């Protein structure tokens, strides 16, 4: 979205809609009809917990090994921390020689994994979004 210069994203509806809406439009919410969080709500919460309230376009970390089909977007948080959003349908590994410490977040699972290395970091790339945070 940074490449397309979007400023905002709008949600269609916060919660699922009742039978007054068409069948097609009843289940778009982040919450179900009883206001219980759906998995997408939890993933979005985890995503926003890591990204913070605002992001500026940034550069992804320097890499000397990347899997095929990698989607890679660099950001900088308001506090100056750098973020790398990435995934690849093929999966694989990414080697980041310029990093010695970082934290890897999986917003879908809600996990965070500290990473350290003396010759850079090797990160397993999955087909789902992951976020790497470093200074």
Question: What do these predicted regions represent?
Answer:
Residues 32, 66, 77, 103-107, ...:
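Acidic surface patches and DE-rich sequence motifs
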Residues 115-135:
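C-terminal beta-strand-rich structural cap/linker in extracellular carbohydrate-active enzymes
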Residues 17, 92, 110-112:
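Surface-exposed, flexible loop/turn segments at secondary-structure boundaries
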Residues 98-112:
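Solvent-exposed beta-hairpin/edge-strand motifs
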Residues 63-100:
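Carbohydrate-binding surface patches
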Residues 1-45, 49, 58-67:
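Aromatic/acidic polysaccharide-binding cleft in carbohydrate-active enzymes
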Residues 81-82, 102, 121, 130:
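Hydrophobic residues embedded in beta-strands of well-ordered beta-sheets
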